[in-house]
Amino acid sequence: MAVPKRKKSKSRRNMHRSHHAIKPKNIVVCTTTGEFMLPHSIAVDGSYKGKRVFIKQQAE
């Protein structure tokens, strides 16, 4: 089993963890529905960048 040769200092430990921070999600407002959503995703009504790309089918 691998064992560290020397103890990592608090500074080195914290530098190692610098990329572990929780970053806030980027939320945008849909241009057609006005709802909040994640970027680069299809809106609830099936539109993407203001154009209809997905049309819901009626349930039978």
UniProtKB/Swiss-Prot annotation:
List the GO molecular function terms: structural constituent of ribosome
One GO biological process term is: translation
Any one Pfam family here would be Ribosomal_L32p
RNA-binding listed as a keyword: no
Provide this UniProt record's keywords sorted from A to Z.
Ribonucleoprotein, Ribosomal protein
Superkingdom, according to UniProt? Answer: Bacteria
Output the Gene Ontology cellular-component terms: large ribosomal subunit
**Chain spans, region Disordered:** 1-23
Q: Which family does it belong to?
A: Belongs to the bacterial ribosomal protein bL32 family.
The protein's name is Large ribosomal subunit protein bL32
Organism per entry: Wolbachia sp. subsp. Brugia malayi (strain TRS)
